[in-house]
């Protein structure tokens, strides 16, 4: 059955499983980088607690770099696919070339921040000189060699735009394997490689990213024959750049909100480095679980969008129903694992002084996974039905408008000694449940306006 016929005729429940599994695996793989780094760093013989705290503080910048790279790639992907569909190979070459030009600009900004901005950034979140030193070392390496993750994101979308997503997954696997192999060698010092500690973790990460980017560059040059390649096509075209960001900017904003939320939470938890570290470690576990929902969302959106395009009310309704059911099943599994085995995760990271805070955070915040997963599914449904504004509203509620003021208010009671740190963790389930209620109202409205009117 051809891809078009599958989207038209295959039962939606089977289609969602078939499309969702590869995307879920791909998204889960992206979360491996952060978990692997923290696990190996947490088991360093000396300074592991400070190193884990440092990794927690640098994480928002890493997320922001990825957000800008992926958002630019999303805009490139959509514009390139549309241009190729129109048969305009020359414009397609310019789109690809301009995306690479933008990649260079993004890298230059990251490089300059890595040289001049890391001290001020780390110092804004801690006064511990050991944590500042480790955070600066790690973040400087990640920023100065950030061309790996930036160009991986762009080449990934260039391959996906021409239907070659399998090759981008291969690149992800290679990068993850390289990172996992190099982490213990460079962190602990094995064979002729000296012990480098937290710097070794940074080098292992960026080498894995560069390996992925290099492999995807080769795939791009060898396989993407639908349009020409060449330095000449990198000449900036303001019209094309505007088109790329007209599509990609909402994706950048949505991803950047996550970075802002983590940074502000680090500031709120500044009174307790152990609580900061616990939150950072838990966030990486949470990201792994929620990335399962993100992967399924990437199947929900095209299935419902295709059905919307063919005016099939039944397939839209099936897409919404099965998308929510499968998301809830995934999140129930995630909640079960994190509620039953918090101690195992603490051992994986060798959480040390942060152990009690980490287990407390896991037991409370993981309650929110089901509501968070539903919110992610809602956003995929909105996007499929041209509801970009509704999707942005949910992002703002979850990552800015509710969570940060609530956590800030709760932290006042904690700092005054009236309540324990666990009070701050309750801000997450409250936020996700509230956003889920708003999301349900928005879903009813968008179904009434966009779906019920279909013939």
Model segments located where?
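Short alpha-helical transmembrane segments in multi-pass integral membrane proteins
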Residues: 1-20, 80-147, 193-248, 304-368, ...
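Transmembrane alpha-helix boundary and packing residues in multipass membrane permease domains
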Residues: 23, 27, 39, 78, ...
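Helix-terminus/linker motif at the lipid-water interface of multi-pass membrane proteins
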Residues: 28, 32-53, 122-129, 185-196, ...
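Small-residue-rich hydrophobic transmembrane alpha-helices
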Residues: 52-112, 149-168, 278-342, 372-386, ...
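Short runs within selected transmembrane alpha-helices of multi-pass transporters and secretion channels
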Residues: 73, 142-160, 168-176, 201-216, ...
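N-terminal transmembrane alpha-helices
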Residues: 7-39, 43-47, 60-75, 79, ...
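Transmembrane helical elements of multi-pass membrane transporters/channels
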Residues: 18-37, 141, 175, 208-212, ...
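Small-residue hotspots at the loop-to-helix junctions and early N-terminal turns
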Residues: 49-60, 135, 139, 273-288, ...
């Amino acid at each position: 059955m051809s891809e078009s016929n599958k989207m038209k005729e295959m039962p939606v429940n089977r289609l969602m499983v078939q499309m969702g599994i590869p995307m879920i695996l791909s998204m889960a793989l992206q979360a491996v980088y952060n978990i692997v780094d923290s696990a190996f760093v947490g088991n360093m013989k000396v300074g592991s607690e400070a190193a884990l705290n440092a990794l927690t503080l640098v994480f928002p910048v890493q997320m922001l770099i990825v957000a800008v790279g992926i958002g630019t790639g999303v805009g490139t992907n959509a514009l390139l696919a549309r241009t190729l569909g129109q048969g305009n190979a020359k414009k397609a070459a310019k789109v690809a070339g301009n995306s690479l030009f933008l990649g260079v600009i993004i890298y230059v900004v990251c490089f300059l921040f890595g040289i001049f901005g890391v001290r001020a950034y780390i110092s804004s979140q801690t006064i511990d000189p050991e944590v500042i030193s480790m955070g600066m070392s790690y973040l400087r390496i990640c920023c100065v060699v950030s061309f790996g993750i930036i160009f991986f994101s762009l080449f990934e979308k260039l391959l996906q735009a021409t239907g070659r997503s399998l090759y981008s997954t291969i690149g992800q696997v290679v990068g993850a394997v390289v990172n996992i192999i190099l982490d213990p060698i460079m962190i602990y010092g094995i064979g002729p490689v000296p012990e480098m500690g937290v710097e070794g973790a940074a080098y292992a990460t960026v080498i894995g990213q560069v390996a992925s980017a290099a492999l995807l560059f080769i795939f791009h040059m060898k396989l993407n024959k639908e349009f020409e390649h060449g330095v000449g096509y990198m000449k900036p075209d303001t019209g094309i750049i505007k088109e790329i960001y007209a599509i990609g900017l909402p994706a950048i904003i949505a991803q950047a909100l996550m970075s802002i939320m983590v940074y502000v939470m680090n500031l709120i938890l500044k009174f307790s480095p152990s609580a900061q570290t616990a939150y950072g470690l838990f966030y990486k576990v949470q990201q792994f679980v929620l990335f399962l929902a993100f992967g399924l969302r990437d199947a929900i959106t095209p299935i419902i969008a295709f059905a919307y395009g063919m005016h099939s009310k039944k397939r839209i309704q099936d897409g919404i129903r099965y998308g929510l059911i499968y998301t809830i099943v995934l999140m129930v599994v995630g909640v079960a694992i994190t509620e039953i085995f918090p101690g195992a995760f603490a051992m994986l990271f060798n959480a040390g002084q942060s152990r009690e805070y980490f287990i407390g955070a896991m037991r409370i915040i993981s309650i929110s996974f089901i509501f968070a997963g539903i919110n992610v599914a809602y956003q995929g449904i909105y996007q499929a039905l041209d509801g970009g504004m509704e999707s942005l509203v949910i992002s703002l509620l979850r990552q800015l408008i509710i969570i940060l003021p609530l956590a800030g208010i709760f932290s006042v009671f904690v700092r005054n000694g009236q309540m324990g740190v666990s009070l701050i963790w309750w801000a997450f389930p409250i936020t996700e449940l509230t956003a889920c209620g708003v999301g349900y109202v928005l879903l009813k409205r968008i179904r009434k306006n966009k779906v019920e009117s279909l013939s």
